[in-house]
Amino acid sequence: DDYIAHKLTPGKKGSWSEGTARQKPNKLNVFRSVFGDKSAAELTRDDMDDYIEIAYKIPSNFENPTYKKFEGITLDMVLTNAPEIDAIDYGVRGAGTVRDDLKTIRAFLNWVLKRKDETSLQTAINALDNEISDIDYESSRRAFTDEELKTLLQDDNTASENYVKGFSNPINFWLPLIALYTGARIAEICQLHLTDIKQVKALSSNVEHWCIDINDDGDKKLKTKNSKRQIPIHQNLINAGLITYADDLKAKRATKLFPDAARASDQFGGQSQWFGIYSGKAGITDRDTAFHSFRHCFTNYLNNRHTPEDLVIALSGHQYKSIAKSTYDRNRKRDVGKLAEVIDSIDYGLAHPEWKN
């Protein structure tokens, strides 16, 4: 309340404009409803991780008092899928709206931090910073073109190591290929354990499919709960030797698929930096491309071929645009056989060499 009063004071430095003053208090009130009586100065990184998860589930226009659809509906009803909202189908907010929401919360917490220097509060703000940066990064990238993929993954180029000359480090060989054929984020791939490479039986048959299990077990962290998923392994990855590579590591009693992947502040910046250098030497200099472009290649391929939305979401870990569909899908078990059919249909027209230790 003190913060809102401060920002509503006319003529004060940093005060809200008339339009902003109609929006920001409602966003802050939704934020306050999540934590109840807990003081803002006591908020921690874990609290912010929880709120970020919730921020992606808040319905579009939920905080707008003129939106009559939500009269009598509380955030708790939405998050628990209460009977009161069964008859309401509405969309979740886009990434840009979530980013603006998080920026509003960050400004508030920075204001609190100036008045109460709490170390835990700074870690909470850091969590918001990271998520805002991730949204900016992902939304500003495009997919690689077919020619760019060929340059990066098939042809010789000026990089000292490539798919023609060979790689001395397995993570540099596998990271781009796994991203292209699974749509997984760089952190999701770098943190994989050997136990995440597993065979899963299809519900509709007794056929087992090799899968990559994206989960948050142990020291692993995911962007959202929707990120948990099992992705069948494309035959091109199997032919390139991914299963053999994993088996060799198991024989050496390793635990991680990429033991050399280094995490810092929940990011794998070293691997991202390596790819930036590699792609630059390969001649891909467009700033709208980055490692995340592989994820766009994957989802674009599926969407351009009219793959059903539920299968695209099951493979990519994206959020449904509809809350009702999201809740329904989260409570059903996905048939890995159907997912394998989608993965096996992917053909970028590329030839890949086999990994050699």
Where are these regions (language model features)?
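Short, charged phosphate-coordinating catalytic segments
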Residues: N110-A124, I171, A179-E208, E309-A314
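Short, aromatic/basic-rich helix-turn unit that serves as a nucleic-acid recognition element
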Residues: D1-K27, G36-A40
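Active-site/catalytic core of tyrosine-dependent DNA strand-transfer enzymes
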Residues: F108, L149, D156, D217-G218, ...
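N-terminal DNA-binding recognition helix of tyrosine site-specific recombinases/integrases
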Residues: K27-V30, K38-D46, N61-A127
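C-terminal catalytic core of tyrosine-transesterase DNA break-rejoin enzymes
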Residues: G96, W174-L177, Y181, G270, ...
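Catalytic-site neighborhood detector that most strongly recognizes the C-terminal catalytic loop/helix
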Residues: A143, S316-W355
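Basic, Lys/Arg- and aromatic-enriched nucleic-acid-binding interface segment
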Residues: A82-K103, T123-I186, C190
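Conserved tyrosine-mediated DNA breakage-rejoining catalytic core shared by Y-recombinases
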Residues: N130, Q191-A240
